[in-house]
């Protein structure tokens, strides 16, 4: 069954969210951004994933059995396990604004790109202009420059 409802909608009605992949963590990131305790199961074995900066055994698990065992311990503990499902160590790297306006920012950025192409500008000029405008509106620290060789 599929739905057009965002994953965070289900997350908001849950005590803890579980995400079964590291290869596609967007649903987990959405839930963690909302402050919902979110667990990750690394079924594929991706030790180089950014997610391994999160505490193993509290947020990231190598298999479902370990995650479910920890989840049961968390629910049995009167105050839960401290730091369980807590992404606060890295969540700011995924959305430094945390204001719910990411769609507006990316939409504006894409609009600037489209405007540049409609004007017939060179790709590099379009990209540089959009980056400069984004910097001016939302901060230079939010723009990453990757120079091609």
Question: Which sequence ranges carry the predicted segments?
Answer:
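Nucleotide-activated donor-binding/catalytic signature segment of Leloir-type glycosyltransferases, i.e.
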Residues: 1-4
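Catalytic binding pocket for nucleotide-activated donors in carbohydrate/polymer assembly enzymes
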Residues: 16, 21-98
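Short alpha-helical donor nucleotide-sugar binding micro-motif in glycosyltransferases
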Residues: 7-14
């Amino acid at each position: 069954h599929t739905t057009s409802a965002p994953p965070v909608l289900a997350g908001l009605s849950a005590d803890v969210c579980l995400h079964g992949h590291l290869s596609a963590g967007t649903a987990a990131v959405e839930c963690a951004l909302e402050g919902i305790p979110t667990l990750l199961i690394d079924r594929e074995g991706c030790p180089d994933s950014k997610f391994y900066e999160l505490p193993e055994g509290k947020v990231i698990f190598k298999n479902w059995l370990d995650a479910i065992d920890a989840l049961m311990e968390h629910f049995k503990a009167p105050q839960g396990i401290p730091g369980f499902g807590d992404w606060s160590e890295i969540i700011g790297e995924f959305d430094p604004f945390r204001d719910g306006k990411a769609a507006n920012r990316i939409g504006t950025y894409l609009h600037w790109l489209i405007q540049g192409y409609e004007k017939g500008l060179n790709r590099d000029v379009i990209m540089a202009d959009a980056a400069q405008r984004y910097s001016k509106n939302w901060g230079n620290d939010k723009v990453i420059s990757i120079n091609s060789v």
